[in-house]
Amino acid sequence: MRLLKTEAIVLKNNLIGETDKIATLFTKSYGKLQAVAKGARRSKSRFVNAIRPFVVANYVIFEGQNYYYIDQWELIEAHKNIEKDLAKFSVASYIAETINKILEENQKSERLYLFLKHSLKAVDELQIDPLIFISSYNLKLVSLLGYMPQLDNCVVCGKRENLKYFSNSCGGAVCINCKNKCFDAKPLHEVTLKAIKYFLKGDYDKLQNIKVSGVIKEEVDKIITAYMKEHLEIEFKSKDFINNLQNM
C-alpha cells in the first residue's frame, strides 16, 4: 500500500456512495488526483471540512485497489472569506475550474500549484472586482503556460508604433501596417492595450484601487477570453456566472 504525504488544494468534490465524498486535489508533490474521504457526508465526520472547495491542507493519502483515500489531514488555509462572499466564491470557482481542466490526472507542476495558492489567497484577502481579477488571472495563467501575448511590439514586424489591433492566432498586438497579415486581427483601443499590460504585469494587490470603465473591462475580458479559447482550446462554464454577476 503506497502512502502519500503532501500539501494539496481542493479543486472540487462530489458525492460517492451513501456516506462518502470524492475530492479532486491538486497536490504539490504528486499533481492532480482523486481521493475519497470516507464518511465525509456525515456532519460529525473528521473529514467534513477536509475536502471543502479551496481548502489548503497537508494530507496523508493511501492508495487502495481502486481509489486513493484520505487518511489524515491538517488545515493550512480555509479561505473563509471566499465562503461568505458570492463574488469571491464565483471567482474562486472559476480559478479552480481552469486548473482542473488544464491538468491531466497525476500531472505535476509546482509553479502552477504555487500560482493557484497565491491566486486563491488574493481572492480571499483582497477587495476585488471580479472581472478585473479574472482578466489579470487569465493573463498570468496563459503566460505561465507558455502563451504570453506579445503586447509591447507588433507580433508580425516587431515595431512598437501604431499597435491598433489584436490577433489571437498571431499571438498579440498588431500594428496598422500588418493587420492584413493576421486574418482575425480586431481593432484594439489604446486604453484597452494599457489595461491588458497592467493586468498582466501587476500583482493582484495593485488591482484593488484601479479605476477602469465598464466598457474597457468588458473589452479586455472579451479579448482575453477569446485568446484563451484559441490557445488552450477549453471553455469554462463558471465564467458565465461571473458575467451574469456583472450585469446584476
UniProtKB/Swiss-Prot annotation:
Origin superkingdom: Bacteria
Sorted alphabetically, which InterPro entries does this protein's record hold? ARFGAP/RecO, DNA_rep/recomb_RecO_N, NA-bd_OB-fold, RecO, RecO_C
Q: GO CC terms on record?
A: bacterial nucleoid
For the biological process aspect of GO, one term held by this record is: double-strand break repair
Query: Keyword DNA repair: yes or no?
Result: yes
What are the UniProt keywords, alphabetically?
A: DNA damage, DNA recombination, DNA repair
Homology family = Belongs to the RecO family.
Name the PANTHER family for this protein.
DNA REPAIR PROTEIN RECO
What HAMAP family would the database entry show? Answer: RecO
Q: What does this protein do?
A: Involved in DNA repair and RecF pathway recombination.
Listed name of the protein = DNA repair protein RecO
| Organism per entry | Thermoanaerobacter sp. (strain X514)
